[in-house]
């Protein structure tokens, strides 16, 4: 089963947007960054941020991970229903993978906060994440994009 992180487990986009604003402020003397000018797809935005970081900002992914670790409890809380569904699916020996367009450091911090990291077999992040996960798990893999569908799958 391929589970969309942001649609099912917890929406990381507000945390991402706040990090972009913080990074733009924090690094403005090194390299200007306009968060509103970045592509909506976070995988594509990561490529732009890689070029931005070459101007002397350094490892933006590590900065994102630190920011997320410090603030993730404010943005994401585990859902009892989703946790129960993941437990049921794991108990039924269902292979679970998570996909997101978010950068991997943000996705990993989110999964840990949500308690899902120990239940999943694979995480694919960035551009083409779903395609990579389906390639890994097989074309017959069920794709889940909302919590209600996850609950239904766990009862099957």
Regions found by a protein language model. Give the residues of each.
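N-terminal helical cap/lid subdomain that shapes the substrate entry/recognition surface
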Residues: 1-80
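Hydrophobic alpha-helix position signal
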Residues: 24, 49-52, 89, 111, ...
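Flexible, charged surface loops at secondary-structure boundaries
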Residues: 31-32, 90-91, 135-139
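Short glycine/proline-centered loop/turn elements that form peptide/ligand docking sites
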Residues: 57-58, 83-88, 151-152
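Short, acidic loop-to-helix structural element flanking the phosphoryl-transfer center
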Residues: 70-98
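Conserved phosphate-coupling serine/threonine residues in phosphotransfer and NTP-handling enzymes
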Residues: 100-102
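Asp-based, Mg2+/Mn2+-dependent phosphohydrolase catalytic module
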Residues: 104, 108-156
């Amino acid at each position: 089963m391929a589970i969309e992180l942001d649609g099912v487990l917890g929406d990381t986009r507000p945390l991402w947007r706040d990090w972009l604003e913080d990074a733009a402020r924090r690094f403005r003397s090194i390299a200007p960054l306009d968060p509103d000018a970045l592509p909506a797809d976070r995988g594509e935005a990561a490529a732009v941020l890689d070029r931005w970081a070459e101007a002397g900002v350094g490892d933006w992914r590590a900065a994102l991970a630190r920011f997320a670790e410090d603030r993730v409890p404010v943005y994401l809380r585990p859902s009892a229903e989703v946790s129960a569904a993941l437990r049921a699916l794991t108990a039924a020996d269902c292979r679970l993978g998570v996909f997101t367009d978010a950068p991997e450091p943000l996705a990993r911090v989110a999964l840990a906060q949500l308690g899902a990291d120990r239940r999943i077999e694979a995480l694919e992040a960035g551009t083409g994440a779903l395609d990579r996960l389906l390639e890994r798990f097989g074309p017959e893999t069920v794709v889940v994009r909302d919590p209600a569908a996850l609950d239904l799958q766990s009862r099957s």
